[in-house]
Amino acid sequence: MNIHEYQAKALLKSFGAPVADGVAIFSADEAEAAAKQLPGPLYVVKSQIHAGGRGKGKFKELSPDAKGGVRLAKSIEDVVANSKDMLGNTLVTKQTGPAGKQVNRLYIEDGADIDRELYLSILVDRSVGQVAFVVSTEGGMDIETVAHDTPEKIITVAIDPAAGVTAADSTAISDALKLEGAAREDGAKLFPILYKAFVEKDMALLEVNPLIVMTNGRLRVLDAKVSFDGNALFRHEDIRALRDKSEEDEKEIQAHEYDLAYVALDGNIGCMVNGAGLAMATMDIIKLYGAEPANFLDVGGGATKEKVTAAFKIITADPAVQGILVNIFGGIMKCDVIAEGVLAAVKEVGLKVPLVVRLEGTNVELGKKIINESGLNVISADDLDDAAQKIVKAVKG
């Protein structure tokens, strides 16, 4: 689960991290009052969407030369004008895709005198099985370019879970970031704070980009992105309350309600599969034959007819879907249950695109019989390779 920047900063501030003062607003009418709560005279007006690259993003409704989703304001009047310009419009960034995201809230923040911009994140490094700090002296908006062009400038420091962030760890991180004087002292305090927040709140990612050294030599968290492990949210009621469903894909919200593992993608072939590994293999083979999957969807091993029906309806609700591939290897999952669920969904929502079904495993003959006797125009496939070729051919004509 993701949260907004202002929510992430409030959370980190509660753990003791150095964060600038700021106020979240939901309408331009609130902009003046928000700015007056801050010291000034420099302000930053930040679009709050669940996507990176806001500073270099562009608003669909504004001219191409208009400023992006993060703007500097040198007066309260500038804050108000920028708020009116940004709220309600659609911000397109590298991470939103061409559809963009509507900006429904802004964060008005006190400006900072920046000397250096650094990058810091905390994540689970699966290569070593530990939580790790990933840091770089090349912070700011272009960290993706740094990672691609000069990966040697990105340093990883793994943390022993039994010891937490030790003095040696802090020294290693500070050395990697080339911190000196007051900034180094601040780092020795900040790194354990961020690690504590990451562990206690079951985060999947904590990204500070940039972490800045100000002209007075002190450290400050200038931007923050936090994602939480969805499997641990049951023990964090305070975090669940921060969820903004308007930032999430409606289909993914529906899938969550039925305990379906669904991720929307940019392709045109919908997939319904049981098992994450088989689902990924199905997406790979669709791509191998020259098409793109529209989603990842794992119905799980113990899906009911109702669950399968819901999954099919979620797929068909995507206007980009031009064909559907159902690929089931029945172990715990029974092929006849899949067949009944698909037919129930088709009868309810109709079948306007080609449908290829590949069934194998438990009750496979019964499942095929149910589909064959349905009278529906369903294309049967013998194996995964055959299924992928048939759905790609049906879509491309």
From Swiss-Prot:
EC number(s) stated in the UniProt entry for this protein: 6.2.1.5
Annotated GO biological process: succinyl-CoA metabolic process; tricarboxylic acid cycle
Residues involved in substrate binding: N274, G331, I332, M333
Highest classification ranks of the organism: Bacteria, Pseudomonadati, Pseudomonadota, Alphaproteobacteria, Hyphomicrobiales
Name this protein carries in UniProt: Succinate--CoA ligase [ADP-forming] subunit beta
Pathway the protein takes part in: Carbohydrate metabolism; tricarboxylic acid cycle; succinate from succinyl-CoA (ligase route): step 1/1
PANTHER family: SUCCINATE--COA LIGASE [GDP-FORMING] SUBUNIT BETA, MITOCHONDRIAL, SUCCINYL-COA SYNTHETASE BETA CHAIN
A single Gene Ontology CC term: succinate-CoA ligase complex
Class in the EC hierarchy, top level: ligase
Cofactor binding note from Swiss-Prot or TrEMBL: Binds 1 Mg(2+) ion per subunit.
Record-linked HAMAP family: Succ_CoA_beta (MF_00558)
Obligatory cofactor(s): Mg(2+)
Primary gene name: sucC
UniProt xrefs under Gene3D superfamilies: ATP-grasp fold, A domain, ATP-grasp fold, B domain, Succinyl-CoA synthetase domains
Every ATP-grasp domain range: 9-254
Keywords: ATP-binding, Ligase, Magnesium, Metal-binding, Nucleotide-binding, Tricarboxylic acid cycle
Family classification: Belongs to the succinate/malate CoA ligase beta subunit family.
Pfam families: ATP-grasp_2, Ligase_CoA
Catalytic activity from the UniProt record: succinate + ATP + CoA = succinyl-CoA + ADP + phosphate; GTP + succinate + CoA = succinyl-CoA + GDP + phosphate
InterPro entries linked to this entry: ATP-grasp (IPR011761), ATP-grasp_succ-CoA_synth-type (IPR013650), ATP_grasp_subdomain_1 (IPR013815), Succ-CoA_synthase_bsu_CS (IPR017866), SUCC_ACL_C (IPR005811), Succ_CoA_ligase-like_bsu (IPR005809), Succinyl-CoA_synth-like (IPR016102)
Role summary: Succinyl-CoA synthetase functions in the citric acid cycle (TCA), coupling the hydrolysis of succinyl-CoA to the synthesis of either ATP or GTP and thus represents the only step of substrate-level phosphorylation in the TCA. The beta subunit provides nucleotide specificity of the enzyme and binds the substrate succinate, while the binding sites for coenzyme A and phosphate are found in the alpha subunit.
PROSITE patterns with a match to the protein in the record: ATP_GRASP (PS50975), SUCCINYL_COA_LIG_3 (PS01217)
GO molecular function, one term: succinate-CoA ligase (ADP-forming) activity
Subunit comment: Heterotetramer of two alpha and two beta subunits.
